[in-house]
């Protein structure tokens, strides 16, 4: 069913709006950000090349507790912090060829006004109600502790969690007051629990709607499958926070709207700002018959496939037509991590060292399918670029244009049926796979076309043919330059600056390439004055890659030293109060043996395990260790289980216990030194 939905064709007669998940204005841009924005930019460029009316908007996410905490640490205002990173992101995107029709800011007046309007509409339609809830409060700091101001224990899976999300364990969204054993993140003190009135959105009333909606959503399978699981157990959603920074809740100046309400509303506000500047009507996209497509990271599927469509439905806006969720990025086969040094900063680690943005665009787009994880290492980057862009694509363009220039040939002729067929195959691949969000297949088709060109050039040996049969040689070169023209057009969405260089070397105005249409790749090249060709790509040398690898290695070592120092401090100061032997005796620890294990659909972290505890039948226990252990590795392992933990549901799957693991550089299962029978008590 998903495959049928993804085969929907472009262009269509409806306007298309493409958005990207908003970068959080709390730190600099890294390549993990580009995993979303570069594919979205390629998608937009391709649609336009196919004649599709398309608008492309994004902006900085300016609200939420992390920004307030960071601003306090730097002794500046939240707006000053946001402005600093807003400018950085805007600059990085432009340098990398990600060109939005509008790049806005959720703290700007348009978003404040649109957010208040939508919240008021939800209230008017009966989807919002007040409720007194228990919230964390720090008596030491004398402040409320919303969201990431507080840390504690997840009530569902017992993992360490932050106030609004169990990001380490079961990945659930947590409502204010749900977290157990809350502690202030600012001073480390134990938090008090106080009662306060907040406002809730009736998300629980949208269950049937969401189930039906998700079945019609033109989304990547990872987005739909993940959201389907969550749609089965909806709870009403607290949409206010007691903060000073943010969009004020209508009629209650002491509260602000939760950041995950006003952030996606930014998509609408940015469209309004674009439309005003362009003399268009924003309602054609947000209240008319349009196709709205969100490009997001895999970590914010819940918000875009559950919260957001329910809000839009409740307020009477057009629903998203598609959600495109990317895989993550690993660095050196390690989980992307700032604290552990496995990170690549776009400006400091890439652009500042002279690497062309198009190389990174190509690597991200061509490495693997969009929903799968990318691994970035400097050696893999070097190998892929040198083999494909330098060795095939760039080599073909250079040898053809250099040969023609050196011989002073006027290229004229007719297109060889084999060449027109190869070009048409590449065109058809673009037209088919863009609707499937299969950007790698499109990149592969471009390299295949350049390989066809290299083979054609080499097999016809124009350096000999020019002496033996000049007319035949001219026709061969005409077909070669036709492929070069096709490559420039078809690769513009992937490597826009390099494609423009080719376009200029063909004698066209580089600025006109963006207005070329995909079928122009088959329009015969008309001979024209051409400038002297220049080298398109240069080989990435071992010395340069070794230099970049050294920078990465040193960063990882420094991060490890810092983490080890922090661990030592934590060991000197126990974080939890001492317990009595009676407290410990309340836990029933038993030896278990894993007899079956499988991944939970829609989750990257969770495994569903069947554990033999010496009982009549095995226990089903959910564990958050899928990033460290595969299901195959789990089967047969002896583990330690808390057997009397209250049953709970995690992503709709019942869990009857907890498998114990040590958390150091990834979870490590606890086991016994000598063989023990399943069910043996641990004392």
Swiss-Prot record:
EC number: 6.1.1.10
CDD domains assigned: Anticodon_Ia_Met, MetRS_core, tRNA_bind_EcMetRS_like
'KMSKS' region (motif): residue ranges: 335-339
Annotated binding of ATP, by residue: 338
Top-level lineage group: Archaea
Compartments (UniProt record): Cytoplasm
Cellular component GO terms, alphabetical: aminoacyl-tRNA synthetase multienzyme complex; cytosol
Reactions catalysed according to its record: tRNA(Met) + L-methionine + ATP = L-methionyl-tRNA(Met) + AMP + diphosphate
Domain tRNA-binding, first and last residues per copy: 583-683
Motif 'HIGH' region per UniProt: ranges: 23-33
Primary localisation category: cytoplasm
Molecular-function annotations in GO: ATP binding; metal ion binding; methionine-tRNA ligase activity; tRNA binding
Subunit comment: Homodimer.
PANTHER family the UniProt entry points to: METHIONINE--TRNA LIGASE (PTHR45765), METHIONINE--TRNA LIGASE, CYTOPLASMIC (PTHR45765:SF1)
Record's function text: Is required not only for elongation of protein synthesis but also for the initiation of all mRNA translation through initiator tRNA(fMet) aminoacylation.
Family: Belongs to the class-I aminoacyl-tRNA synthetase family. MetG type 1 subfamily.
Protein name (database record): Methionine--tRNA ligase
Organism encoding this protein: Methanocella arvoryzae (strain DSM 22066 / NBRC 105507 / MRE50)
């Amino acid at each position: 069913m998903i495959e049928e939905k993804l085969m929907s064709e472009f262009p269509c007669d409806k306007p298309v709006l493409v958005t990207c998940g908003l970068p959080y204005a709390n730190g600099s841009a890294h390549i993990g950000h580009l995993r979303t924005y570069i594919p979205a930019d390629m998608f937009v460029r391709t649609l336009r090349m196919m004649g599709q009316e398309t608008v492309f908007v994004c902006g900085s996410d300016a609200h939420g507790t992390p920004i307030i905490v960071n601003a306090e640490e730097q002794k500046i205002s939240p707006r000053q912090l946001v402005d600093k990173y807003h400018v950085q992101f805007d600059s990085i995107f432009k340098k990398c060829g990600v060109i939005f029709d509008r790049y806005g800011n959720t703290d700007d007046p348009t978003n404040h006004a649109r957010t208040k309007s939508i919240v008021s509409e939800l209230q008017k339609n009966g989807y919002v109600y007040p409720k007194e809830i228990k919230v964390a409060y720090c008596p030491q700091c004398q402040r409320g502790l919303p969201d990431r101001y507080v840390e504690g224990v997840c009530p569902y899976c017992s993992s360490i969690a932050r106030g609004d999300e169990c990001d380490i364990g079961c990945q659930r969204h947590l409502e204010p007051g749900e977290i157990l054993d809350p502690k202030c993140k600012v001073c480390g003190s134990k938090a008090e629990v106080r009662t306060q009135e907040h406002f809730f959105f009736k998300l629980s009333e949208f269950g049937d709607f969401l189930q039906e909606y998700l079945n019609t959503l033109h989304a990547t399978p990872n987005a739909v499958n993940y959201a389907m699981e969550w749609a089965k157990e909806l709870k009403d959603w607290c949409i206010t926070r007691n903060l000073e920074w943010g969009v004020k809740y209508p009629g209650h100046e002491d509260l602000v709207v939760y950041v995950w309400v006003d952030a996606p509303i930014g998509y609408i506000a940015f469209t309004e700002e674009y439309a005003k500047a362009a003399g268009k009507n924003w309602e054609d996209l947000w209240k008319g018959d349009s196709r709205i497509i969100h490009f997001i990271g895999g970590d914010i599927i819940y918000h875009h496939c559950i919260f957001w469509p329910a809000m839009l439905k409740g307020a009477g806006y057009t629903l998203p037509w598609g959600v495109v969720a990317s895989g993550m990025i690993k660095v050196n086969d390690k989980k992307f991590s700032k604290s552990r040094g496995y990170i690549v900063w776009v400006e400091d680690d890439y652009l500042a060292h002279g690497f062309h943005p198009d190389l990174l665009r190509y690597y991200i787009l061509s490495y693997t399918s969009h929903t799968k994880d990318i691994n970035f290492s400097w050696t893999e980057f070097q190998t892929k670029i040198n083999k494909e862009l330098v060795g095939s694509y760039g080599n073909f363009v250079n040898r053809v244009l250099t040969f023609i220039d050196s011989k002073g040939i006027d290229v004229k002729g007719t297109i060889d049926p084999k060449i027109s067929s190869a070009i048409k195959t590449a065109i058809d691949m673009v037209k088919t796979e863009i609707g499937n969000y299969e950007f790698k297949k499109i990149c592969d088709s471009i390299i295949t076309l350049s390989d066809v060109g290299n083979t054609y050039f080499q097999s016809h040996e124009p350096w000999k043919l020019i002496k033996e049969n000049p007319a035949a040689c001219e026709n061969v070169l005409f077909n070669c330059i036709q492929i070069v023209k096709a490559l420039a057009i078809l690769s513009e969405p992937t490597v826009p600056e390099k494609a423009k260089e080719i376009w200029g070397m063909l004698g066209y105005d580089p600025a006109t390439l963006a207005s070329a249409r995909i079928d122009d790749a088959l329009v015969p090249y008309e001979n024209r004055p051409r400038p002297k060709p220049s080298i398109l790509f240069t080989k990435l040398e071992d010395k340069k890659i070794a230099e970049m690898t050294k920078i990465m290695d040193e960063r990882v070592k420094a991060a490890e030293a810092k983490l080890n120092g922090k661990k030592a401090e934590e060991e000197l100061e126990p974080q939890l109060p001492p317990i009595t032997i009676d407290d410990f005796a309340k836990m029933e620890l038993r030896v278990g043996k894993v007899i079956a294990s499988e991944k939970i659909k829609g989750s990257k972290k969770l495994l569903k395990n069947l554990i033999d505890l010496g009982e009549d039948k095995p226990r089903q226990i959910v564990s958050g260790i899928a990033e460290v252990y595969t299901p195959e590795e789990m089967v047969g392992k002896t583990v330690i289980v808390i057997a009397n933990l209250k049953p709970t549901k995690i992503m709709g799957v019942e869990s009857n216990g907890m498998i114990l693991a040590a958390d150091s550089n990834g979870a490590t299962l606890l086991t016994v030194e000598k063989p023990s029978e399943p069910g043996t008590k641990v004392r």
